[in-house]
Structures are given as structure tokens and as C-alpha cells.
A protein has these predicted regions:
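Short, low-complexity N-terminal intrinsically disordered segments enriched in polar/charged residues
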Residues: 1-38, 163-169
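A beta-strand edge to alpha-helix "cap/lid" segment located at domain peripheries
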Residues: 3-8, 57-169
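Short helix-capping and hinge/turn segments at secondary-structure transitions, especially at repeat
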Residues: 25, 37, 41, 60-68
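Short solvent-exposed beta->alpha transition segments
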Residues: 41-62
């Protein structure tokens, strides 16, 4: 992620977003943490912290809870050294009977000009349970959403964005 440095163009901002998506989909906290400055400031929902060790600790706990995690990030907006993304991911919640859930949210990122690493990350998101009682199976006639990221679905498939729009707007 650090190889792409600000100031961003539409193309480089898009590359940064997809690189981050791919890194997060590895679910490797140590590898993911390399994209952030040593003193990076994070807000993730109601958690506020700073620094590489805290990032690794947070991500380790996150992915211990969020099993079968699959994430999609899309470029929302950008300026010189800032990028905003919308994202959604699905996972099975190991703290809630392995129910399938989908998280929807927005992030804003600020990058260091010299290193290209993220120096601030703020995330706000909400979760919904998928299927009846979290089984992940859609029941359209009842308005119950199911999983989008079935095992053979590419997270970058354009139909996922269409599903988001159709389901909620």
C-alpha cells in the first residue's frame, strides 16, 4: 500500500482502495499493519487507539470473532492525501452462534506524503443479520436478506453494488 503515494489521482486512489481490500481479505494482522504509520490513529466504531501494536491486537481480535470474512471496498471520494471508501463485508460471528452478518460502512483515510502509509483511519459501520436467525439464506418474499458473497462470488463482481442499491434504496 505504501508504494502508492499522494497526491492521488482517480486511478491511484482506486488502486490504493483495491490494494487495501485485498490486504484485509488476507486476514493477516501483521501484513495489514504494514500499510499504516507506526503512530497511526484509528477509530473503529467505538474503539479509539494508536500505533502498530494496537492495530495488530485489534485485527487479531476482530478476525477471531469474524470468521469466513469477505470484504469489498469501493472508492467514494478523494483529495490530495485523503481517500473515503464505502465498504461492506460478510462474516460468521463466532461470538453469536456463528450467525451470518453483513457490515456496511464508510471509512476516511489520511496518508503520509513521504511514505504513502495511512496515518489516520476512521470507520463507522452497522451490522445486519443475514437470513432467518443468521443462517445466511435469503427469503425474498419475507424481505429477509441472504448472503451475497457465496463461495464462488468474486467480491469485485459489479452485481454486488447492484444488490446493495436494490436492497436498500
Amino acid at each position: 500500500m505504501a508504494a502508492i503515494r499522494p497526491p492521488f489521482t482517480r486511478e491511484t486512489a482506486q488502486e490504493k482502495v483495491k490494494f487495501a481490500q485485498n490486504m484485509w481479505n488476507t486476514r493477516n494482522p501483521e501484513q495489514v499493519s504494514k500499510g499504516y504509520t507506526a503512530d497511526c490513529v484509528w477509530r473503529n466504531r467505538d474503539a479509539f487507539f494508536r500505533g502498530t501494536n494496537k492495530i495488530i491486537e485489534f485485527l487479531t481480535e476482530k478476525w477471531a470473532k469474524e470468521k469466513n470474512y469477505r470484504l469489498r471496498k469501493e472508492l467514494f471520494a478523494f483529495t490530495d492525501n485523503k481517500i473515503a471508501v464505502q465498504f461492506w463485508y460478510e462474516y460468521q460471528d463466532s461470538h453469536d452462534g456463528m450467525k451470518w452478518k453483513r457490515c456496511y460502512g464508510l471509512e476516511d483515510w489520511t496518508f503520509d506524503y513521504e511514505t504513502g502509509k495511512m496515518k489516520k483511519r476512521q470507520m463507522s459501520a452497522n451490522d445486519i443479520v443475514l437470513g432467518r436467525d443468521g443462517d445466511g439464506v435469503a427469503v425474498p418474499e419475507s424481505g429477509i436478506e441472504g448472503r451475497w458473497y457465496l463461495d464462488d462470488v468474486d467480491v469485485d463482481d459489479p452485481s454486488v453494488t447492484e444488490k446493495l442499491t436494490d436492497a436498500h434504496f
